[in-house]
Amino acid sequence: MGYKLKRWPLVAFTFTGIGLGVVLAACSALNTSNLFPRQNRSKQLIGFTENNIIKPEAVLKAALAEDNGTETILRVNFGEALKSWYQNNKDRNIATRLTIFSENVEDEHDNLLDQKQQAEPINWPIELQKEYDQWGGSESSWKALKLYDRLIADFQSLIFSNIVANVQLTDGSDQFKPTTKDNLDSTSNKIKFVNSKPNDPNGEFFANLQAYLFAQWVVEENPLPLTQAFFAYQAPKDGLDSLYDQAAIGSALQLGYAFPAFREPNNGQSQGKTTFDPTPNSAQNFGDFIKAVFPEQKNGQTQQSNTSSRTGLFDWQTKWNTNGAANKLLVTKSNLRGAFKGVGLATAIIDQYEYLVGGSKTSSLPEVKVDSNKSNQNPLDSFFMEGKDAVAIRSIVSRAKIAMTDQTPGFKVNPAFVKVKQSQQNDTFYQNQRKLSGGQSGDNNSQGKHHYLQDAVRLTSSQAMAAASTGADSSSGTNVGGSSGGNSVLIPLPRSAALTHTQQQVQQTTSTLQTPVYARGDDGTYALAIDGGDYFLANNKRDFTKQADILLYRYLQAKSNNFKENGVEFSLNLLESGSLFQTWAQTGLTAKLYGALVAMMGSGQGTQVKGSVQGSSRAASVSVQTTQQNRQQSTDTQESEVVKLAKSLLKSSADLAKPFTDNPTFKKALTDIQSEYKDYLAAAGKLSEFKKDLGEVSGLQQAIIDRADKYIQLEKQAQKSAIGLGQPLPYQRASDGSYPALEKFFIPEDSAADGKVKASESGSAALVTLKTTDSQKSTNTVKQPDIKPTRENNDKKLKQLTSDVETKASSLITKWGATPQIGSQFSEIVSLKSKDNKPQTNMILALLSDVGIKWTKILNSFKEWFFTNTNDFKNNYDSEKKELKGNEYKDFNDLVKQTLYLRSWQRLTSKEKFGYYKELGSVKAQAAQSGMVSLSSSAAVANAVASSGMQKSGDQTLLELGKKAFESELEASSSDGQYKYLRFLSTLMWLVKDGAKNYKRLLQQAITVGTRAFVSWTVSYDDTATASAAAAKAQVAVLKTAQATNTQSDNPFNKFVQNPDYVQGSETNWFNDKSTPIKPDSLLESESTYNFTAEPFDDKTKSQKRSTGGTTNEKHFFGFNGLTINSPQSVSTASAGLTEQIFNNFGQLVTSSDKSGALSQYKDKATLKRLIQNTNSDAELNAFGEVLHRAVNVDTSNLGRFNSSGEPLISFDNKKKFLVDVVDKLDDVYFNKFEGYVGQTKVKMSDSSSSSQGTKTIRKPKPHHSPRTRVSRLWAMSFRLPTRTLTKFLLVEKLIRTVL
């Protein structure tokens, strides 16, 4: 083990400036320009030959693996199919349009030709070919694609040109009805897509297609109509600094999320007073809102209006929205994050959705009682709570040992964050804010109570809370902002609990009526409800027909200005240009149009035609079944949910498939596409949609990370008071960094055993029936939402879908049988032709090959071939395990992984991306669990896992996190991680082969004669844990130095600091992890915290044990800086503070007694004398004189002087004699090789120092001098030998381990 550890520095060395920069310069950059297959102008085919790097199959497969494959295939084939629709259309105006488009293309080509001939009279054929190359490589492909693009764009415009007029209200006989208020609310009337142009031969076809696309959008995008009431923050009448402590907070005191406030209503607001403020008062609006939405002593809640056909509608008055904010919003899964200011509002909507659909039986938000009889309400009061220590908390700022439980009520307020002024007045309006930091209104820890803060809650009336209180534990907390009545239950409640008997009678189809979610935003507080959510999310499912009905109902209400309630008005852009629906339809337009037409064409057969893309297959069979028999019903015999929804949106006599019988040529063209491409298009559609969903999940995670990082930075910068009322979001994060309770809104869980339809069979946001146990039926016990990590399952799903696409693409490529063909003599793309030599297929091949050859994956394959095609690399690289093999290299594998894992993890923008770690871990144990290496027995595996700490539930080691980061780099299709990994291994092999001769040569080049070079470790730690970061940064003295012995337990160089400089976030649980973060070391500033060498601190002890065959007491050196060279050409990245200490403070005569090591770069007196005697340059002698003057304070000023004649005062020979005499008289202590701690003064390694500045350490570098003369001793014997000559290797081992 001792020998293998010495490979670590060599691996590390390649990441230093010298190890990587110099080696790559020596190897030269890889020039891939001459590797790309292309055809030269002599028609000699040089691409895709037998001896070329890649084959056509590889390029085509790369192109087909991405969305571009679907778009290219359909661009050509669907474009050609549309020609038949235009040519054979009953509307002769449509056929005329085709003729006009064809003529336009010819005109455009003539103009292009004229432009090129005029601009390049001689080279115009070359320039013209460049244009052709972008459109398939020939004149015919250029014209065809130009026409196809025009037809597709025109077809899309025809579809949507009349969509607004086609949405109409109809009666039971499918007859038009005016959109009056009564007609809209009548249960006998339905909203349909109808043909508003009965004389148009294509009118019915367009209406059908509109209905289908709208249905597909509803199923896939899950559009949610929202009703909102917005209450903008407003500063108190005496200013924000009358509430918050301006002196403590400083310039960060700005009205907003961190420092929210509302102006007290009726305070100088009365008409006739000189202080009248015409601005609407948000607090007054909030009070009016509560009184209207939660009236006391009434059987029902008028917050929701119930028509005879629709329930759960929210009609909130426009006046409740401050500053004219809209009271109706439309969000989908694709725009949810961008629809709000702050991710907290978006997550609150997701929680509300999950709460209504019943997928988790609960919510992450507590229900809070509001008192509609209370006057002078502060809109912030609903977020404040108080409780005893028995209540779990989401923050560990107090270091209280309180475990997370399922009844977590909120975020425990840290008084260090909240600086609120105390008032001498009895201002009950602000009393809860003043409680947060203690004082007049109640101490923050009075009577054993603590104050808590919610980011979002669910508002409910006292009636609902009274109904819910039976059987619930009311001791968990108290809402300090509600009524003066009894305590309210501050835990998430099952929906069935929040009902009065009358409400249950009103709506029999659901377990409860919705209570609005109330959340804090950046600019104010928001009350939000999913309009009609109880209607279309009833019975634990999403009813697509009812969801579409609500959307269209609200759309016609807004369009006709026929609103149900007085004071309620809104607009809703549902179908017009620029709407979310049309934006979605125009993204991947060709695929959506083709998929819709194919599904419609097959609908008349009773089953959906398979192979459509962009969601038809995903949307299939998401209907919620309540019995096991129905769950098992084959999707092959079920109509697509999209088709069923589309039919419900059309007149009863409508037939989606009928228009195709009127144009059999068009139908045949679509059928031909299906016949050839259905398997690939279906697989590619699933992959595309899943990747889109993953993108939304990733975006949500990143938004939460960015939000948390903002607060972490404030803590790191000792600006806690700027955090104010900032808090974590209430949604728990899993150990892998995912937020499962939120992410299932985008990617439903694959859990058929629980009654959920698999994600591959469902619409993206559809959640379905859940099994209800007897215990759940009879109790109000709250269950914490499942926080099972999602990343691994998502990765598996992505790999599965990707593999499926690759398989289908391979079959397609085999069918094509593509081979190179000679194209234009001026073409710069490789032309391919298929076996059948069809023009459309050849056009597809040309487009795919041009795209594929530029794809990152293909580009990387060229680079990787540069390594894998060399015999030396192939013979020493295991391509299956992706690691080195062979006696000379295989022992490096663990250290290679360790190095790369840590490097990848350190490069993460957010170190919390994959969760927290508890310890360093073991490479072998980590690799054994992942199958990367084999251990001899199951016992060995168990022991390895135990030693790494991986058996602890919820804990991860640093190397486990590093492995995740490393693998994500390798697997990213848009990165060149795999190539860089091979380059790293190749560089390592080049460095260490043949006794590391290249490694030694590079070191000798870097450490020139007389150059000072050090290797060093830098760490710091705070013994008292009381210093502020700002004060610590001002300290530069070395304090309380640890003893350099193996037995010194507090040796900072052997101590693994788990969270230095807040690298894994602050002590506050800003990410709301189940496993809370560890306390940060806010004083450590080393940039190489996790770089280390596995060696004992005392080399002598290790050497003695090795020589006797004993085991070594190996320890990790943390905070490793690597090799630092004092040279203008140095490529060292060492910090300025480090170089100042080791090169300026050390190495020159500071005091008369401070001599040790001043000339250590010359090894000894004899070496320096020999260098002077062998010098033939006068300038070099003068330089030696300057070195001696600076290092030992010898007066050498006359060496460089000249007499009046311009001749040197001292001759060359006399200079040399003078310098040799000076050196000969020097004390040997000047040549001591320095090892020790360096602060403002030099101290030996075993010394300890103290300072009047206290006991806090900011920097503690331990340099180790590495003279050039030691380099030649490296690798004098093989690493594999069991014994070695100690006199040769004592210094070598130190040098080897120092180069990270």
Swiss-Prot record:
Q: Membrane topology type, per the record? A: Lipid-anchor
PROSITE patterns, sorted: PROKAR_LIPOPROTEIN
Main location (coarse class)? membrane
Q: Where is the composition biased (Low complexity)?
A: 464-478
> Positions of the region Disordered?
464-487, 620-639, 774-797, 1244-1269
Please indicate if the UniProt record lists Signal as a keyword.
yes
**Cellular compartments annotated:** Cell membrane
Question: What are the Polar residues biased-composition ranges?
Answer: 620-637, 774-783
Q: Where is the composition biased (Basic and acidic residues)?
A: 785-797
- Where is this chain compositionally biased, Basic residues type? 1257-1269
Q: Which GO terms describe its cellular component?
A: plasma membrane
Keyword annotations for this protein, in alphabetical order, are:
Cell membrane, Lipoprotein, Membrane, Palmitate, Signal
What domain of life? Bacteria
Q: What is this protein called?
A: Uncharacterized lipoprotein MG338 homolog
Q: Which organism is it from?
A: Mycoplasma pneumoniae (strain ATCC 29342 / M129 / Subtype 1) (Mycoplasmoides pneumoniae)
Lineage, opening ranks: Bacteria, Bacillati, Mycoplasmatota, Mycoplasmoidales, Mycoplasmoidaceae
